[in-house]
Regions:
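Alpha-helical multipass membrane-protein architecture
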Residues: 1-589
């Protein structure tokens, strides 16, 4: 020990700093569980969430430095890598598996689904590792998300302060969510009190989580907000002015035909018009994003060729290539078993074909998305998932609707999980590159956490569906609904084709503007209940005002940690109440 001028004891370290330690892994697991539950819950509400790495880095400082008094930045980097690997399932699973619940196909084998997602995650990591040196060391792709996390890690004092602010957000959001659940006050009908017409839908969703997500997204969320306002504050008044909205009597008849009770005008507009158009916009925007990413796809292929020529995979900085081969072969075998046994109707040949195609798609998509997110900080994951499941459902179409849906989503979820893990690892490796971490140890940490996310998310989906219902007003699950609508359209052909096509055209047009994901963002505004959009607006305005009045530094150092706490607090309380509802329901019945 040494004594500073202030009289404080300071540890003098000799030898290497701790990095891949049991403490870093266990802390990463705990933080990963917290973040994954929160982000998974947020994803079911908004259709998107936030990268878990920055939250994990902030929380990691609070635990490792603030509580455990450990001072290694690279140990926190490993903890953050492990936590974000667990959180990879929040997008990987939430973008795909909810479609089964929305379609009513809940009798699938959850254990097979978990093993399939784990196999997909392993493949995604193993395929992308050989490209690390090419993409990060040589091409120097920016990976803005990874740079942001490195900035947090390089400011250890600020990291502890941010952790305290985050806990304040957790307590505030958790308290509001608890009161909201106990009192059942989940929406505030402000529009009725100020005389707003019913069709303008002046109802606010009571959710600090939504405000937190919006604050973190900042100006990037404006397009999402614009989509919602275009529906209810522009198009709806125009329809009313032209006398194209149904009368109360007609609305009652429509409600009986749709099987809806208490069908309000805003709900009618959403079900009949805005939601189908929004689904079309999501599909059109996602697929156009793939087309626009073709130059990046070419760069990805060149990166693979360069890596092969220079023997990048054999670098001592990476995991041994033989271990990667073993992992790939083992994961492909598991994926094949999952595909063959996913449903009774599945034959061996068809199942093997699905597994092989899924593996090829994982390899291609993981590289493509890693290139996209490295250059633009945006990846067309939803579009890649839609394409994968479309190919799979065409292969399984002759098995019958139920079998085709379940088997396609099982393999499709594995591909989605792989894409999520590949992009997450590259972001973390960029962070490690900037703080001096050893890539091999980060890669081991990523592998060690791949199993936990799918276990957590599949279980969470069953809990939330039983308590609230996936696809409901409380948990709209936009990405899962889009996937479900697409599968239903392929198998049954009973879809509002013209509305979907109109939306797809609009989404494609918006996506060509050069603003990454614009068609998808505006489409989400069309699709989601306007109450969520209104509340989201508060967070967007707060971020813009904070940047302008207090400065961007204040927003990043104070605002974002509090906003992250708002996400975690409500997410944990929401899941806690879901478990409570199920237990009390069982006891009561």
């Amino acid at each position: 020990m040494a004594e500073t001028e202030a009289g404080e004891n300071r540890i003098i370290r000799r030898g290497p700093y701790p990095e891949l330690t049991l403490t870093s892994i266990l802390v990463g697991y705990v933080l990963g569980v917290l973040i994954t539950i929160s982000m998974g819950y947020a994803c079911l509400i908004l259709g998107f969430s936030h990268e878990g790495s920055e939250l994990a880095a902030i929380l990691g400082f609070g635990v490792l430095r603030g509580i455990l008094r450990r001072n290694s930045i690279i140990e926190n980097n490993i903890s953050q890598t492990v936590a974000s690997s667990v959180n990879g399932a929040s997008a990987g699973v939430m973008f795909s598996v909810p479609a089964l619940f929305i379609l009513g196909e809940t009798d699938f084998n959850p254990y097979l689904m978990v093993f399939g997602c784990i196999a997909g995650g392993i493949l995604g990591i193993a395929f992308i590792i050989p490209l690390r040196k090419q993409m990060i060391d040589f091409e120097r792709l920016t990976y803005p998300g990874g740079v942001a996390v490195a900035t947090v890690l390089k400011s250890p004092g600020a990291g502890v302060h941010k952790a305290i602010l985050l806990m304040i957000g957790v307590i505030l959001s958790g308290t509001v969510a608890f009161i909201s659940n106990v009192t059942k006050f989940e929406n505030w009908a402000l529009g009725q009190h100020i005389g707003m017409p019913d069709y303008m839908n002046g109802i606010w969703f009571v959710s600090l989580l939504t405000i937190g997500i919006a604050f973190i997204a900042g100006k990037g969320g404006l397009c999402f907000v614009i989509g919602g306002y275009a529906c209810y504050w522009v198009l709806a008044p125009i329809l009313a002015r032209m006398n194209l909205l149904p009368s109360p009597e007609q609305l009652q008849v429509i409600a009986e035909r749709l099987g809806e009770q208490n069908l309000s005008m805003p709900k009618y507009l959403r079900i009949v018009l805005f939601r189908p158009v929004g689904i079309g916009m999501l599909v059109g925007g996602a697929l156009t994003g793939i087309v626009l990413a073709l130059p990046l796809i070419v760069n990805s292929i060149r990166s693979m060729q360069s890596a092969a020529k220079t023997g990048m995979a054999l670098s001592k900085d990476e995991m041994p290539i033989k271990l990667l081969y073993i992992g790939i072969i083992g994961a492909v075998i598991v994926l094949g078993i999952v595909a063959v046994t996913s449903v009774e109707e599945m034959g061996i040949v068809r199942g093997i074909v699905m597994a092989v195609l899924g593996t090829i798609w994982i390899w291609m998509a993981g590289v493509i998305l890693s290139e996209c997110i490295g250059r633009t900080n945006w990846s067309p994951m939803s579009g890649m998932t839609l394409i994968a499941v479309t190919i799979l459902i065409v292969i399984t179409r002759g098995l019958g609707d139920r079998a085709a849906i379940i088997s396609s989503v099982m393999v499709g979820a594995a591909t989605c999980m792989a894409m999520s893990q590949a992009t997450d690892l590259m972001l973390d490796l960029k962070t490690g590159y900037l703080v001096g971490a050893i890539p091999r140890k980060q890669q081991i940490g990523q592998f060690l956490a791949t199993w936990l996310g799918p276990v957590l998310m599949i279980g969470l989906l069953f809990v939330l569906h039983k308590a609230y219902g996936l696809g409901s007003e409380k948990l709209p699950a936009p990405q899962g609904t889009v996937l479900a609508s697409m599968m239903r359209g392929i198998l049954e052909g009973n879809v509002p084709v013209y509305k979907y096509l109109a939306g797809a055209g609009l989404g494609a047009l918006l996506s060509t503007t050069g603003i990454g994901g614009l068609g998808i963002q505006v489409g989400l505004g069309f699709y989601l209940p306007f109450s969520i959009v209104l509340t989201y607006t508060i967070g967007t305005i707060l971020r813009i005002a904070s940047d302008k009045i207090k400065g961007q530094h204040f927003s990043e150092q104070v605002g974002i940690p509090i906003a992250a706490g708002l996400i975690i607090g409500e997410g944990i309380v929401g899941v806690g109440f879901a478990i409570y509802y199920i237990i009390t329901g069982m006891q009561g019945g």
